[in-house]
């Protein structure tokens, strides 16, 4: 149809045909759809395109992305941009602040009296307790005191082994190395002792303090130092000191080796910044502490009724987060702070790596946290400014037309095999929208915080990834593990064999199977763990939000009253989310599946298509 129609356009010229563009600005992508209307009112879809959204959704920098997408779509039908007669923009309902998602936990800053560590290749096995002694002071050691020797990387493994063998009269029970040379030293020792290596900040190790080290046998993990009472036994701690050492013990669970050093206990100071309370200003004024967890927070949100605004307790982690969102949104929208309101949040339980202060090698332990996505509304809608800017740049009329969810449901109706009443779920990067379109034309819509970006953030947080891009890729692609140069094990347990050898750099690594290439995950995380975190993050965000959004728009708030649901938006393209939703909605007897907009576009382009369809409905514009 595309090529035929483009010839048609050139032949008839612009006099009889009107070219209209529908533009959907999303949190992550900007999609456009071009259609033509003849004098006889006949309508034809011509082309579509999508580009990455430039700037925060609903702000002036979006114009660049819109122009780029329009140029691409017009280029596909061989027409210049100037030939457009009308541009219709979506009413980009509330904007989501980029910083609106973060995990909130209680921060405890303590001058730790313990240090834990976990290198990958220790040597020897067993546990040892003794006073720390630097290798350069080995000649000052006394024969009746048990020692743990400490050697910096200035000493080669041969020197370290020679010194240990030379001073056999000393009671040396363990060894801590800065270099990654535990096995090399062990092979040269006359007497076998547990050895822990790769202690980066060895200069911070306090000499003559008591320390315990433990190395587990291959394939097992340590038992004494990952247990607070085990540490108490080895280092002779009292009840209060044992309580203070619990985070260290927790951080060492599952490790192959560890060091715990007892530093002077007079300097433990705790400075707690509480997680804080959330205040809901709705039909009812309600408050809840973050520590109650995501389920109770979401129940309280529901009990509060229609929300006018949400904020947090001053000088707490959640209070600081909400005020930061409002300030950054006010800057973007050029509004006053009090004109910015948070109208919805999605809270999700997660685990966040918390750094243990005083750690020798940047150890962290996983603490319970709550991830929050917030929906932000500004008093005036910045979309009008975008329309004005586009008019200036393109010399073409631009109008803001129609609420996103309504447009998406109009677009979804072009999916073959659908009929009214129809429910749609538009799952994008920042928000999940739902709408129910009744046979008599009535529409009910809702717009909720939390979608693809929150999933990415949860994956990044729980796996402790440095790069957000890696988290985004883990969300999008299935996993595999390269087990030889000619085969890999897929995440479902199946094997895939290759006739050509795989790049040796991937050997032994977990990889992501992107179209046409493998992407190596640099972090050393087991495939099963990545799989579990990815699925759990999608389930927590998408399945929970979908049910919440559909219940909001369902007749009588009863899910069984919805016969069928069409999934649209970027996240509906995901390789597992639609199946997860099908399973979750099956118990309500709802037919649910990915949309196929206009029979060609898949789940994308629904809003842009709806903007064109709604134009035909009220073609007095332009």
Where on the chain are the PLM-derived regions?
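A short acidic Gly-Thr/Ser loop motif
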Residues: 23-29, 90-92, 179, 424-432, ...
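Short N-terminal binding/cap micro-motifs at the start of the first secondary-structure element
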Residues: 29-32, 96-97
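A short helix-loop
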Residues: 467-490
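Glycine-rich phosphate-binding loop of actin/hexokinase-like ATP-binding domains
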Residues: 32, 41-56, 420-465
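Nucleotide/phosphate-binding catalytic cleft detector across ATP-hydrolyzing
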Residues: 1-2, 7-22, 37-44, 50-421, ...
């Amino acid at each position: 149809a595309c090529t035929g129609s483009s010839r048609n356009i050139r032949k008839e010229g612009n006099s009889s045909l009107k070219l209209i563009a529908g533009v959907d600005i999303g949190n992550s992508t900007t999609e456009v759809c071009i259609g033509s209307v003849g004098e006889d009112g006949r309508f034809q879809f011509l082309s579509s395109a999508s580009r990455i959204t430039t700037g925060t959704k609903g702000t002036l920098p979006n114009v660049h992305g819109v122009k780029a997408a329009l140029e691409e779509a017009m280029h596909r039908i061989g027409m210049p941009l100037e030939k457009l007669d009308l541009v219709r923009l979506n009413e980009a309902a509330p904007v989501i602040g980029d910083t609106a998602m973060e995990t909130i936990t209680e921060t405890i800053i303590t001058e730790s009296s313990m240090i834990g560590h976990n290198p990958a290749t220790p040597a020897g096995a067993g546990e040892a307790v003794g006073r720390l002694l630097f290798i350069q002071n080995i000649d000052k050691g006394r024969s009746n005191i048990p020692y743990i020797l400490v050697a910096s990387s200035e000493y080669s493994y041969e020197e370290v082994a020679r010194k240990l063998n030379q001073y056999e009269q000393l009671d040396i029970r363990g060894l801590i190395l800065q270099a990654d040379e535990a096995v090399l030293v062990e092979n040269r020792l006359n007497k076998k002792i547990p050895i822990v290596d790769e202690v980066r900040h060895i200069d911070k190790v306090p000499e003559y303090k008591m320390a315990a080290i433990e190395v587990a046998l291959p394939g097992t993990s340590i038992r004494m130092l990952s247990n607070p009472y085990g540490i108490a036994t080895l280092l002779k701690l009292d009840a209060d000191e044992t309580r203070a050492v619990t985070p260290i013990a927790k951080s060492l669970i599952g490790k192959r080796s560890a060091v715990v050093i007892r530093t002077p206990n007079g300097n433990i100071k705790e400075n707690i910044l509480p997680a804080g309370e959330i205040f809901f200003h709705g039909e009812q004024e309600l408050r809840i502490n973050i520590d109650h967890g995501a389920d109770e927070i979401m129940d309280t949100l529901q009990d509060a009724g229609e929300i006018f605004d949400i904020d947090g307790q001053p000088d707490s982690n959640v209070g600081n987060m909400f005020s930061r969102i409002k300030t950054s949104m006010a800057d973007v929208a050029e509004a006053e702070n009090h004109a910015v309101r948070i109208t919805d949040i999605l809270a999700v339980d997660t685990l966040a790596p918390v750094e243990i202060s005083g750690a020798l090698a940047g150890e962290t332990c996983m603490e319970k946290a709550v991830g929050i996505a917030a929906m932000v509304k500004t008093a005036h809608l910045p979309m009008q400014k975008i329309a004005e800017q586009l008019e200036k740049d393109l010399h073409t009329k631009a109008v803001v037309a129609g609420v996103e969810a309504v447009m998406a449901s109009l677009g979804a109706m072009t999916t073959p095999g659908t009929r009214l009443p129809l429910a749609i779920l538009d799952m994008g990067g920042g928000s999940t929208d739902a709408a129910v379109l009744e046979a008599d034309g009535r529409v009910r819509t809702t717009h909720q915080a939390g979608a693809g970006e929150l999933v990415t953030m949860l994956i990044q947080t729980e796996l402790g990834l440095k790069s957000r891009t890696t988290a985004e890729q883990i969300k999008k692609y299935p996993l595999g593990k390269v087990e030889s140069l000619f085969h890999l094990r897929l995440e479902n347990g199946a094997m895939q064999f290759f006739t050509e050898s795989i790049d040796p750099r991937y050997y032994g690594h977990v990889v992501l199977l992107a179209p046409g290439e493998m992407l190596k995950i640099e972090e050393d995380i087991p495939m099963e763990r990545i799989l579990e975190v990815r699925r759990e993050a999608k389930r927590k965000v998408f399945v929970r939000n979908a049910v919440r959004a559909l219940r909001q728009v369902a007749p009588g708030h009863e899910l069984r009253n919805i016969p069928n649901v069409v999934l649209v938006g970027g996240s509906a393209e995901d390789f597992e989310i639609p199946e997860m939703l099908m399973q979750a909605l099956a118990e309500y007897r709802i037919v649910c599946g990915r949309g196929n907009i206009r029979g060609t576009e898949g789940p994308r382009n629904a809003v842009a298509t709806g903007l064109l369809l709604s134009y035909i409905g009220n073609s007095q514009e332009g």
